[in-house]
């Protein structure tokens, strides 16, 4: 059988990042074009509507950084909500915590889940068979609207970059509703874009979260497959966040299972805000 290699590129502001390899699947869902390619270095990689979402090589930079600063620092974590996350990586990191009773994963595009289960099995791993994980094919904005007050202990927003499909996940009204359905000590954890490639969106997210939550903190790290390679995650709450704990038994247990995240990595990442972002936030 002949394997045909081709280049697949993401274009961004006059630059492009491409992977060469065999296209394993290319199809249009109800919402977007979905491609999975097999690359010699990055392994299998997922692209949605021309944007790289994840790859087997570097997905843990993203998923471990989104999940563990929140879950390792909060005592009560019975109910967890994941908005997006159809590749399964965020759920995989969540199921490491036995205290969690239920994980609602709300993904608008069922095809992303189906394709991830088939072609990117390593990312979701055991999460797909964990009985605590409940999958809902639904609009995340509408799901949050119909959820009762003070229900979730942690909300993860694991969505794609702002687009026609996801714009409302970055809106004031959405963050306000997320705050409403969080418990008193709950944490909202969201990917907050790149301070380089998506600077204006990044600053907008940070300012909006500061408007609705008493406390918010942002960490920076690397996701090589994304434009510019630097990414961010922001954590917001009404209570003081304990994201810089150095002696946390929960964190020490979890980091043994991680490739990227540990407490030292996290503590440094929370101190990496570029000065141009600091100036913008203070202006």
Swiss-Prot record:
GO terms, molecular function: spermidine synthase activity
What InterPro entries has UniProt attached to this entry? PABS, PABS_CS, SAM-dependent_MTases_sf, Spermi_synthase, Spermidine_synt_N, Spermidine_synt_N_sf
| Annotated localization | Cytoplasm
- The catalytic activity of this protein is classed by the Enzyme Commission as 2.5.1.16
Its keywords, alphabetically, are: Cytoplasm, Polyamine biosynthesis, Spermidine biosynthesis, Transferase
Biological role: Catalyzes the irreversible transfer of a propylamine group from the amino donor S-adenosylmethioninamine (decarboxy-AdoMet) to putrescine (1,4-diaminobutane) to yield spermidine.
Q: What is this protein called?
A: Polyamine aminopropyltransferase
